[in-house]
UniProtKB/Swiss-Prot annotation:
Protein name per Swiss-Prot or TrEMBL: Electron transfer flavoprotein-ubiquinone oxidoreductase, mitochondrial
InterPro entries per UniProt: ETF-QO, ETF-QO/FixC_UQ-bd, ETF-QO/FixX_C, FAD/NAD-bd_sf
Span of domain 4Fe-4S ferredoxin-type: 535-564
GO biological process, one term: electron transport chain
EC number, UniProt record: 1.5.5.1
Classification lineage: Eukaryota, Viridiplantae, Streptophyta, Embryophyta, Tracheophyta
Primary site of residence: mitochondrion
Transit peptide: 1-33
Bound cofactor: record note: Binds 1 [4Fe-4S] cluster.
Pfam families: ETFQO_UQ-bd, Fer4_ETF_QO, NAD_binding_8
Function recorded in the entry: Accepts electrons from ETF and reduces ubiquinone.
Organism name: Oryza sativa subsp. japonica (Rice)
Binding site for a ubiquinone: 276-277
Family per similarity comment: Belongs to the ETF-QO/FixC family.
Length: 575
């Protein structure tokens, strides 16, 4: 508990105006001295200060205000401040925000660059062919999602929500009937060897009558809940599929900057068997968001999404935009692509899963912020009715299936699995779905095998020789990592855990050429030669961007991503 007070005093989240926790110092000290964990009670505990979690918190407090009642609501965020771990494209569709805060356009918000043009390119190695754009971005905005959630956090606090950045929820709390009763943050001040350092502080229990998990894609607690309660099976039934998005924000030359310009591409540098594409979005202040998204069911274990992104930037049509510019920030994050077929039942005893932890991304739109926010709002409404009016959280699941989220994702359900048949068949099936069936086709395609099973043996492929970075347009990983402001306490237990420590050298390296050393966009995993001349896996956990790619793509599902000490990880400000 003293850690909580000390963190607040040190100004964690101070830039966003977050208040110090209102917990009793005397009682906290007594429990700390006795070795116990401080436990605080709220009506609702929200894990994750992203668009879904904050939309849920805001909606709850709005309902309380309208009903002249009150529910205590807290939001935990593992990043050092709100937005520090949030990364997205982002062309923002304001539909959910219009419902949540109808007069937002009259306020000073970071949502200020409307889409002005929308282009779609097919890239070959040296050419960019303009195709009809399949996107309808009229009325949408080019934004930094990390900036938007900071604004949302301030709106939540105005309504009385307590927002606590720098605290990582690491444990689900249950009662004797196996009903979730909240979460606990991890202990800090534990050394790599498991001993307690002088700075040791026990974690804090945040107990709630209702717990909403809004951890984002592949949330560690959410995945445990989904497995333990078989929520995938009681939902739409199919496994989730994923992609890895790698992004930079540049400051480009004034003459090349076109605020609101949106460009998407498909084709080069990815091969015809790999689903993915790139984006370039012009924000304000001469800023350009540029990124590459690669589906994680790719086959070639030698592929490096990071190096594919560096190669993409060297395309003549792309380089001409970047020349003379400067990189401001770098980051990476996985995203859900399973869509309608992969939606789990989001309700569990004592709470619900919202946002990208459940997986509401609309793949053909390349948008998930509006659906994440709406899911949080629906969960908040069900939570309010459950706690105040005696209803049931099943109302969230019922209303979700009646909402525009469900309609949107149903119409979009066949686009992603269409590309299981290859690039050209995927384009053809997508065109059929869009222009002929208009999302109402009489069939529903299934996803292929899970992403980790899609990785081929290395013997079926040749190593890929990527160009060396030039230091102007393309960069090595250490340079990019520095731009992510990633930082972790070095002397702490590893948060990247191997279920079987022999698998990397026994299976991954000889059979798959050590794919973790290729897919990780932060070079966390490296095979190094020991004094005996043997190759051993070395884990640079301090480099971790919290993207979750390893938790998804490892061929034998041997890597478990868990939360490190709160406040560690990337420090995004404009992503």
């Amino acid at each position: 508990m003293q850690r909580v007070l000390r963190a607040a005093a040190a100004g964690i989240g101070h830039a966003s105006g977050h208040r110090a926790p209102r917990w009793g110092a005397a009682a906290a000290a007594a429990r700390w001295l006795s070795g116990g964990r401080e436990a605080m009670s709220y009506d609702v505990v929200v894990v994750g200060a992203g668009p879904a979690g904050l939309a849920a918190a805001i909606r709850l407090k709005q309902l309380c205000r309208d009903a002249d009642t009150d529910l205590s609501v807290c939001v935990l965020e593992k990043g050092s401040e709100v937005g520090a771990h949030v990364l997205s494209g982002n062309v923002f569709e304001p539909r959910a925000l219009d419902e949540l805060i109808p007069k937002w356009r009259q306020e000073d918000t970071p949502i200020r660059v409307p889409v002005s043009s929308d282009k779609f390119w097919l890239l070959t190695k040296n050419k960019a062919w303009t195709l009809p754009s399949p996107f309808d971005n009229k009325g949408n905005y080019v934004i930094s999602l990390s900036q938007m959630v900071r604004w949302m956090a301030s709106k939540a606090e105005e309504l009385g929500v307590e927002v606590y950045p720098g605290f990582a929820a690491s444990e689900i709390l249950y009662d004797e009937n196996q009903i979730v009763t909240g979460v606990a943050t991890n202990d800090v001040g534990i050394a790599k060897d498991g001993s307690k350092r002088e700075t040791f502080q026990p974690g804090v229990e945040l107990r709630g009558r209702m717990t909403l998990l809004a951890e984002g894609c592949r949330g560690s607690l959410s995945e445990k809940i989904i497995r333990n309660h078989k929520l995938r099976e009681s939902g739409q039934g199919q496994h989730q599929t994923y992609a890895l998005g790698i992004k930079e924000v540049w400051e480009i030359e004034e003459g090349k900057h076109k605020p609101g310009s949106v460009i998407h591409t498909v084709g080069w540098p990815l091969d015809s068997k790999t689903y993915g594409g790139s984006f370039m979005y012009h924000l304000d202040d001469r800023q350009l968001a540029i990124g590459l998204v690669v589906a994680l069911n790719y086959q070639n274990p030698f592929m490096s999404p990071y190096d594919e992104f560096q190669k993409f930037k060297q395309h003549p049509a792309v380089r001409t935009i970047l020349d003379g510019g400067t990189v401001l920030q770098y980051g990476a994050r996985t995203l859900n692509e399973g869509g309608f077929q992969s939606i789990p039942n989001p309700v569990f005893p004592g709470g619900a899963i919202i946002g990208c932890s459940a997986g509401f991304l609309n793949v053909p739109k390349i948008k998930g912020t509006h659906t994440a926010m709406k899911s949080g709002m629906l969960a908040a409404e069900a939570t309010f009715k459950t706690l105040v009016e005696g209803s049931s959280m099943e109302l969230y699941w019922e209303n979700l299936k009646k909402s525009w989220i469900w309609e949107e994702l149903y119409r979009a359900r066949n686009y992603r699995p269409a590309f299981e048949y290859g690039f050209i068949p995927g384009i053809a099936l997508s065109a059929l779905e869009r222009y002929v069936f208009k999302g109402k086709s009489p069939f529903t395609l299934k996803h292929g095998i899970p992403d980790h099973e899609a990785t081929d043996m290395a013997s079926l492929h040749s190593p890929i020789q990527y160009p060396k970075p030039d230091g102007q347009i393309s960069f090595d990983v250490p340079t990019s990592l520095y731009r992510s402001s990633t930082n972790h306490e070095h002397d702490q237990p590893p948060h990247l855990r191997l279920r079987d420590p022999t698998v990397p050298e026994r299976v991954n390296l000889p059979l798959y050429a050590g794919p973790e050393s290729h897919y990780c966009p932060a070079r966390v995993y490296e095979y190094v030669t020991d004094e005996k001349g043997d190759q051993k896996l070395h884990i640079n956990a301090q480099n971790c961007l919290h993207c979750k790619a390893c938790d998804i793509k490892d061929p034998k599902q041997n890597i478990e991503w868990t939360v490190p000490e709160g406040g560690g990880g990337p420090g995004y400000t404009v992503m």
